[in-house]
């Protein structure tokens, strides 16, 4: 409590010392244009030390960034390519390349579609895209079920001749799956051969 009550008393004292209005000082009075920033900082630090307040951290202005020595670079980011970072744009970034064993499995060239599905945007036509594609979840599920993930390690029949237009026609002409409207388990049918995780299974040959 005493520390905070002393702060309002200390500030006018600092101002009097800065502007040379203290009568006990024998120096010539200082005008605001003769007071340097270093003088103010020195006085403030002295008052703060007397009051027991921690010294503020030292911050370096941006123009001192040129004084840093040694190679400086920043690695990472969102793969935007070459950038120049820092206050003056003098710190080049390192573009991280995905090579060798560092490449995740999903990034490898052999883990993709040789001819990816490409439905046309609504109301648009163009070469290479499927026109009049049904915008339904069921069609999307069936389309994806019929796709063969291209993988040279496995021998998919006809993978090299995979064609999205033929696939579209095949799905379009396929018989629609019949929806089951009645759930037999809601009608009383029991699940056979299902064991709960924490229960002990009972086998017919065991004695009660």
UniProtKB/Swiss-Prot annotation:
Modified residues (Phosphoserine): 204
Signal peptide: 1-26
GO cellular component: extracellular region; secretory granule
GO molecular function: enzyme inhibitor activity; enzyme regulator activity; unfolded protein binding
GO biological process: intracellular protein transport; neuropeptide signaling pathway; peptide hormone processing; regulation of hormone secretion
InterPro entries, per the entry: Secretogranin_V (IPR007945)
Subcellular location: Secreted
PTM annotation, UniProt: Proteolytically cleaved in the Golgi by a furin-like convertase to generate bioactive peptides.
Disulfide bonds: 120-129
DNA repair as UniProt keyword: no
Keywords for this protein: Chaperone, Cleavage on pair of basic residues, Disulfide bond, Neuropeptide, Phosphoprotein, Secreted, Signal, Sulfation, Transport
TM segment ranges: none
Function according to Swiss-Prot or TrEMBL: Acts as a molecular chaperone for pcsk2, preventing its premature activation in the regulated secretory pathway. Binds to inactive pcsk2 in the endoplasmic reticulum and facilitates its transport from there to later compartments of the secretory pathway where it is proteolytically matured and activated. Also required for cleavage of pcsk2 but does not appear to be involved in its folding.
Family: Belongs to the 7B2 family.
Quaternary data: Interacts with pcsk2 early in the secretory pathway. Dissociation occurs at later stages.
The protein's name in its UniProt record: Neuroendocrine protein 7B2
Organism of derivation: Xenopus laevis (African clawed frog)
């Amino acid at each position: 409590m005493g520390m905070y009550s002393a702060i309002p008393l200390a500030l006018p004292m600092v101002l009097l010392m800065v502007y040379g209005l203290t009568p006990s000082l024998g120096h010539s009075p200082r005008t605001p244009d003769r007071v340097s920033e270093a003088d103010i900082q020195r006085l403030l630090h002295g008052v703060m030390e007397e009051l027991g307040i921690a010294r503020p951290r030292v911050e370096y202005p941006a123009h001192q960034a040129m004084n840093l020595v040694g190679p400086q670079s920043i690695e990472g980011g969102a793969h935007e390519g070459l950038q120049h970072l820092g206050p003056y744009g003098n710190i080049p970034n390192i573009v991280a390349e995905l090579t060798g064993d560092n490449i995740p499995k999903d990034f490898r060239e052999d883990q993709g579609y040789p001819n990816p599905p490409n439905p046309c945007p609504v109301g648009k036509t163009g070469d290479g895209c499927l026109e009049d594609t049904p915008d339904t979840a069921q069609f999307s599920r069936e389309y994806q079920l019929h796709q063969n993930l291209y993988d040279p390690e496995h021998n998919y029949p006809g993978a090299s001749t995979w064609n999205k237009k033929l696939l579209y026609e095949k799905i379009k002409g396929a018989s629609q799956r019949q929806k089951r409207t009645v759930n037999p388990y809601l009608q009383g049918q029991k699940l056979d051969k299902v064991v709960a995780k924490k229960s002990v299974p009972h086998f017919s040959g065991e004695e009660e």
